[in-house]
Amino acid sequence: MTYIVALTGGIGSGKSTVADEFAKLGTTIVDADIIARQVVEPGKPALDAIRLRFGDAVLNADGSLNRSALRQRIFSSPEEKQWLNNLLHPLIHQETQAQFRAISTPYILWVVPLLVENGLQQRAQRILVVDVDRKTQLERTLARDGISLQQAENILAVQATREQRLACADDIIDNSRCPNALAQQVAELHRHYLELAASAADRMAKNE
């Protein structure tokens, strides 16, 4: 089985930027957010179920999912959020495992924004946390998403805390520094993960 490194971090921490740096070095990326979008594409059973549950108000004019409208519907309703999670999480897990099985590179970088919140730590051999302070998170989120400060703070309030993420980390990337510093951190971790993956493969071969 391919060695799995889970990459996580709060909103605005720069997970995609870090993943892009790993991809430049030849690392295979499996992104939970991309898979989550794929399972609700038009024509997929999950989107039909969502439409039946919430009505046409959560669809765009072209029939695709209006993610913003859906977020508004479930944000203040734990029951509806749980229903949606029960629908989507098994589908996301199934597709994730299918992608894992199809990959033959030494290790996979599995990008999972809600790794800690969903208790998925045990599904990876290594956990990498992208870390920035709260002020930086808010500044980046406001600049990127065009939302209000209150909306950004509401998102942070329902995510794992910085301390909770760091407590799960095997490795930490400080993404508050310059791009060159980030590239250097990624290159060092990439070499380390190749070594860990090789060691894990050797142990598995000896046990067969």
Swiss-Prot record:
Keywords: ATP-binding, Coenzyme A biosynthesis, Cytoplasm, Kinase, Nucleotide-binding, Transferase
Binding site for ATP: G12, S13, G14, K15, S16, T17
GO cellular component, one term: cytoplasm
Presence of the UniProt keyword Kinase in the record: yes
Pfam family, one: CoaE
Biological process annotations from GO: coenzyme A biosynthetic process
Pathway: Cofactor biosynthesis; coenzyme A biosynthesis; CoA from (R)-pantothenate: step 5/5
Subcellular location: Cytoplasm
UniProt keyword Ribosomal protein present: no
PANTHER family listed in its UniProt record: BIFUNCTIONAL COENZYME A SYNTHASE-RELATED, DEPHOSPHO-COA KINASE-RELATED
Family named by the database record: Belongs to the CoaE family.
Protein name as catalogued: Dephospho-CoA kinase
